[in-house]
């Protein structure tokens, strides 16, 4: 019973390790990924109804009903997609277990040549005096060869590490697959628009995996927000001063972030993505402080912010406020649309009938994207293994055999890479072995 179970397991592993199956699975994954690139993922239903209407289906059948019925809009989190990826991972593991690891073990074993005729197939060989057989063992050992001797036969190999490359490639692919699966199941993305000085929790969930956990024990505070400009008055960079608070409101980490410089804490990365101006805080007649909301208007690729306020209670003196950016210039227009003042924060603007105002502060918001991907480290590890495997794959695996006859000693060798370099090293080794005769 145990024997039949073991035999069945061996047959199953060999079928899983079949190269044709692995190629077919890899091609299927590639096609699905390409399909996921073509069809936008994780969008609202209205998006697919608008872009893939039933009145004009692509190829005559691809419409929003077709996409949603097959879950092509959430391709990378589908159970059947994970099934194919898992099947491919099983094929790689089976190949590693049944082919690569046994081959590596075989290369570690000695492989003696038992007769002189077997040496004829080697192009690289040399006849030496019979008494140099033992000398060759010490010479090769000093060249970092693993040397074995049995009776009149020698065997040596070097560069076994180069044979580990295929195994590392397999594991790097496995780590990519597992890392991607962990990210899809346990990761999430949150988008937040937060006014300066406000404290917020993660609420506006854009994307999340079935096993993701949002850290509600943390809160976040936007301490400050500002923008730097180029000499041409174009946005150079925008910054957010962020703090992470624990359940007691104590600050556990603080950092100034900007584009491509996120804040990272316990696997959560906070990226700077956008910004906006909500309004202006101003003081009327040096008495009443009010907040004026501003509306964002985009025209010809530029953004403007407009707002209005009445200077008196009779609603007669209405002014319009215009902002181009946060450089400090504020443009004030009257009821007729005429520019009456260009001012900055803190400056007093005087109007007829003893009316005045003073702009005090910009009310800004910062756009933040918060992400957690638990599989990211596995993916980084896979890239590292790929680089290591590329490096060690260039290491030559060299083998040298020795066979003693009645009156001579035959030395032969071969290498899987850098054949010319191995030939030169082989000739050099033979020369050094012969040189030992001069000292004896």
UniProtKB/Swiss-Prot annotation:
Q: Does the keyword Secreted apply?
A: no
The protein's matches in Pfam families, at most eight in alphabetical order, are given as: ResB
The organism's superkingdom is given as: Eukaryota
- According to its UniProt record, where is this protein located? Plastid, Chloroplast thylakoid membrane
Task: Give the record's subunit note.
Answer: May interact with CcsA.
Name the GO terms of the biological process aspect: cytochrome complex assembly
Q: Name one GO cellular component term.
A: chloroplast thylakoid membrane
Indicate where this protein is primarily found.
plastid
Q: In UniProt terms, what function does this protein have?
A: Required during biogenesis of c-type cytochromes (cytochrome c6 and cytochrome f) at the step of heme attachment.
Any idea which UniProt keywords this protein has?
Chloroplast, Cytochrome c-type biogenesis, Membrane, Plastid, Thylakoid, Transmembrane, Transmembrane helix
Bilayer topology reads: Multi-pass membrane protein
Q: What family is this protein classified in?
A: Belongs to the Ccs1/CcsB family.
The membrane spanning regions, by residue number, are: 19-39, 78-98, 164-184
Q: What is this protein called?
A: Cytochrome c biogenesis protein Ccs1
